[in-house]
């Protein structure tokens, strides 16, 4: 079977997360085999993450988190039965997954937060709180992405290993607070964004001040040994880093191919990241491409969170890429779920790459298909769409909403569901190539128009 570049790849079976989750490994391989028998192009990513050099670390972390999840489930069960409802309702809640559950959700979640931090990072461990307070925010991915390069500190503040970055925010520092969005101070834009979403001004100011205070604490917080072990070796962290590597590899290969085939300068090409967050992954791609070729495309970074975009601007300046990015702070979806019209962002321009690899797992099927069609409209003939989703048959899948307590809810999908949604959006099966990360956590879909 060939990929878009005409290269043969072996239709091998996977040893996902080194096979430590036997049930997930079996289900993923069965799913992949079925899809291949139907003529779908599905490949398995390589184990290139540094964590794979420490297989015992991956196995030990998996077992450590499995024990923690079991303990948290028991704590949750006891709390529900003692505090929240009649026996009949309690039995229903007890069987409900770790997600928001109406009026009970906040009460349960608030209670569990105290135990999550201890079970994740050690009985007396509180130094991870600044990171955990960012859950649901794109800033958490700065820590995960740069896990191997973070300095690690002991209980008494001594350096156990010196890394490229001194704190858990990785490359992000306090210069982010000085950034402006469309010429306006960051704080002002953040407050206005909340007001636009129906929050009164006084509450908006209070919430923004609290968030900025939490981010400042995050930027200053050191990384402890237990915290470092988890973010280096857990399945979710591996999956995120592998997703980035896969997306960036596809992007660089495509841009180089277009430059050679169509005799175009990479400098003149256009890439869009829809729901870009801090833009770290895309900026890494730009930096690598510029280092290799001396050229880089213009990248449109589109997100609705002003703070994440301020982080993207700050990082772009550090890497001398500010002239290669366009920042657009826009609400990505209407209240009814309709995707933002890209006409206002792109005008008459066409994209060489449309990427939204960290977004689809938060979207209902209908919105997923609408976003696909909207992006395709602005993609050049021969352009590349890159998207993805967390796998429903992934290893240790209960961890994300359980012990981790991640919000909002992630819609894990089978690989087959990903193919079907893309096909229902008007994309032929032959135009889709899927890469399942070596951890088994994510599938990245590449679609050539």
Language model region names:
Residues 265-277:
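Conserved class I S-adenosyl-L-methionine
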Residues 355:
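A conserved beta-strand element that flanks and buttresses the S-adenosyl-L-methionine
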Residues 352:
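Conserved acidic residues
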Residues 369-381:
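A short glycine-rich, Lys/Arg-flanked "PGG" loop and its adjoining helix->strand segment in the class I
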Residues 336-348:
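Short amphipathic alpha-helix with an adjacent loop that forms part of the alpha/beta core around
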Residues 361-363:
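A short His-aromatic
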Residues 125-183, 196, 210-263:
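Class I SAM-dependent methyltransferase Rossmann-like catalytic core
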Residues 4-111, 136-144, 212, 233-246, ...:
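Class I (Rossmann-like) S-adenosyl-L-methionine-dependent methyltransferase catalytic domain
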């Amino acid at each position: 079977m060939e990929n878009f570049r005409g290269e043969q790849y072996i239709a091998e079976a996977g040893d996902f997360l080194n096979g430590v989750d036997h049930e997930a490994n079996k289900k993923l391989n069965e799913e992949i085999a079925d899809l291949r028998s139907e003529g779908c192009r599905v490949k398995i990513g390589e184990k290139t993450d540094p964590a794979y050099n420490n297989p015992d670390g991956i196995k030990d972390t998996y077992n450590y988190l499995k024990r923690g999840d079991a303990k948290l489930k028991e704590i949750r069960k006891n709390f529900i039965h003692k505090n929240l409802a009649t026996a009949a309702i309690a039995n229903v809640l007890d069987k409900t997954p770790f997600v928001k559950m109406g009026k009970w959700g906040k009460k349960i979640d608030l209670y569990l937060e105290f135990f999550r931090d201890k079970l994740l990072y050690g009985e007396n461990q509180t130094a991870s709180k600044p990171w955990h307070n960012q859950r649901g925010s794109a800033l958490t991915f700065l820590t995960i992405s740069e896990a191997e390069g973070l300095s690690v500190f002991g209980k008494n503040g001594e350096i156990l290993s010196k890394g490229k970055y001194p704190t858990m925010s990785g490359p992000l520092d306090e210069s982010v607070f000085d950034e402006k969005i469309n010429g306006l101070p960051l704080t002002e834009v953040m407050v206005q964004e909340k007001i636009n979403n129906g929050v009164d001004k006084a509450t908006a100011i209070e919430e923004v001040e609290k968030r900025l205070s939490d981010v400042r604490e995050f930027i200053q917080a050191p990384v402890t040994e237990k915290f470092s072990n988890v973010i280096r070796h857990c399945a979710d962290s591996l999956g995120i880093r592998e997703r980035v590597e896969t997306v960036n590899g596809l992007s660089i290969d495509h841009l180089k191919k277009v430059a050679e085939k169509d005799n175009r300068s990479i400098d003149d090409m256009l890439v869009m990241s829809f729901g870009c967050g801090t833009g770290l992954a895309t900026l890494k791609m730009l930096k690598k491409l510029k280092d290799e070729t001396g050229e880089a495309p213009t990248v449109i970074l589109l997100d609705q969170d002003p703070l994440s975009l301020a982080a993207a601007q700050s990082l772009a300046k550090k890497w001398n890429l500010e002239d290669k990015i366009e920042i657009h702070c826009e609400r990505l979806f209407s209240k009814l779920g309709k995707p933002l019209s890209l006409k206002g962002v792109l005008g008459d321009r066409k994209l060489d790459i449309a990427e939204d690899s960290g977004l689809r797992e938060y979207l209902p099927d209908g919105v997923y298909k609408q976003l696909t069609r909207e992006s395709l409209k602005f993609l050049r003939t021969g352009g590349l769409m890159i998207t993805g989703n967390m796998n429903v048959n992934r290893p240790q899948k209960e961890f994300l909403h359980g012990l981790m307590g991640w919000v909002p809810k992630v819609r894990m999908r089978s690989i087959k569901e990903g193919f079907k949604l893309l096909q229902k959006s008007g994309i032929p099966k032959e135009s889709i190539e899927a890469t399942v990360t070596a951890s088994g956590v994510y599938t990245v879909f590449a679609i050539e128009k």
